[in-house]
Amino acid sequence: MKIINIGILAHVDAGKTTLTESLLYASGAISEPGSVEKGTTRTDTMFLERQRGITIQAAVTSFQWHRCKVNIVDTPGHMDFLAEVYRSLAVLDGAILVISAKDGVQAQTRILFHALRKMNIPTVIFINKIDQAGVDLQSVVQSVRDKLSADIIIKQTVSLSPEIVLEENTDIEAWDAVIENNDELLEKYIAGEPISREKLAREEQQRVQDASLFPVYHGSAKNGLGIQPLMDAVTGLFQPIGEQGGAALCGSVFKVEYTDCGQRRVYLRLYSGTLRLRDTVALAGREKLKITEMRIPSKGEIVRTDTAYQGEIVILPSDSVRLNDVLGDQTRLPRKRWREDPLPMLRTTIAPKTAAQRERLLDALTQLADTDPLLRCEVDSITHEIILSFLGRVQLEVVSALLSEKYKLETVVKEPSVIYMERPLKAASHTIHIEVPPNPFWASIGLSVTPLSLGSGVQYESRVSLGYLNQSFQNAVRDGIRYGLEQGLFGWNVTDCKICFEYGLYYSPVSTPADFRSLAPIVLEQALKESGTQLLEPYLSFILYAPQEYLSRAYHDAPKYCATIETAQVKKDEVVFTGEIPARCIQAYRTDLAFYTNGRSVCLTELKGYQAAVGQPVIQPRRPNSRLDKVRHMFQKVM
């Protein structure tokens, strides 16, 4: 039996969860469709998802149709959760993009379609809610052509009055997008020769598989209209990715979750081979894993199984397997699709309302960070504050709600701030010698600092022989440098540089690793002062769509938000800008655009990386260290 994995993507309230329920019901997987309003759906598993009627994390369910098993990964639909959308898309064989007939193509529809195109995911478009009063299907289809792609094929004729009737579109003109891109078919069409439906269907399937043609279907998920033709299209057009018939096992982890009982589970896409209970499989670059239990989606449920075949999604209990881990033969992974893996851009401090809940809060945040690579949790080594780093404000709102609803924790969250970084301006070095005041430590350390290109990260090299200074002392120096890099001259993490341990001296037996660990950050700070540092801030690349009448204002307003316009094009009644903008300015820029365009602008953004900060430096207060601050001040007086 063929197994395919599909995703359902849509703007908020377009009906993708309802569509999932309708697919399960029409295929016979369930006896009654669930309701978003009643909280009985099978894919919105989190209380917050059911409460708000939006999907936050990807869930998996399944149905069978025409000897094909279809696993549905119900991908998230909120803009702050695109990272999980991209991660889920990487395991898909195809996608259904849902558009509300009432609302048409929305800003988020364009963002999601942009991601599908970027990752070359075969996609079928489903125009939902055609039974609502006042819909204009011609206008919706035209907006699909203008704002998404002209390479669409309308698969049905739709009559809305006196009752809704959906019929297969047999008009040869409906196949224009197929015929125009095939020389043989185009010659026959121009010559007036007949073209067989089989040839058209083969060309359609090839184009869909290449993600260069997008069939459009209509219906109403809530009332079951147009669902069977959609299932026929999905099972007929989409083909499983990966090497077919491969014997060697290969699978990739795309999701981690915790059950209400605290059990950790991972979701694995099996690209080749067969996985059996009690197998021992290799984790790429790590230890082996014994399969003691596994589950798969089946007919609307998650069931235990002894065997999982190529193409399947497997759910394993595991405390050690991580996101993106590869089980089995890594060389059999299909050609890697593009996938965004942005860094968190914002951070804040979070605390429980009562001190007694601190450990519970840390445990909960550790679980949440384990399931979301864009959420990071750490405890400040000096102030002991809990620091959260994240991508967007709505993400923080959801974390707070989850802590309240799922973990029963009430928290106090400070206003988020942008995460800046620092980079040395030039090569510099500094040495502090043993027994030379004001050095109170039994250690001599010399460090050099060299700036690297943006995005390089931190490199470290020890040029002091292990034969002279043993490993415990060397490790202490590196630990001290790591601590020193946490606070540069402006108080932010230092990056994009190479640190070399050039010189070390110790006195036996009085010198200890602690002396080297304490002195290293002070030497590093002095080297950075000689170098100077450049403040860096996160930048986003953007694509802006706005009505043509706002071309001048959109262009001339960009510098107000430190945005740079790189290209400008006029397409029909729309202007398209590309450029870059500091992350701290994007929310205000979007708000202003939405205001003067009456909500008709769309701004797609992706993290570009860190660049030189614009404007006055943002200085972060230095975190106190009672052990080292007195020594630092002594050195500042003599330097």
From Swiss-Prot:
Single GO MF descriptor: GTPase activity
Residue stretches making up the tr-type G domain: 1-243
Binding site for GTP: 10-17, 74-78, 128-131
KW Protein biosynthesis (keyword) present: yes
Superkingdom of this protein's organism: Bacteria
Keywords assigned: Antibiotic resistance, GTP-binding, Nucleotide-binding, Protein biosynthesis
Xref: SMART domains: EFG_IV
InterPro entries associated with the record: EFG_II, EFG_III/V, EFG_V-like, G_TR_CS, P-loop_NTPase, Ribosomal_Su5_D2-typ_SF, Ribsml_uS5_D2-typ_fold_subgr, Small_GTP-bd
GO biological process terms, semicolon-separated: response to antibiotic; ribosome disassembly; translation
Family, per entry: Belongs to the TRAFAC class translation factor GTPase superfamily. Classic translation factor GTPase family. TetM/TetO subfamily.
Summary of the function given for this chain in its UniProt record: Abolishes the inhibitory effect of tetracyclin on protein synthesis by a non-covalent modification of the ribosomes.
Name of protein: Tetracycline resistance protein TetW
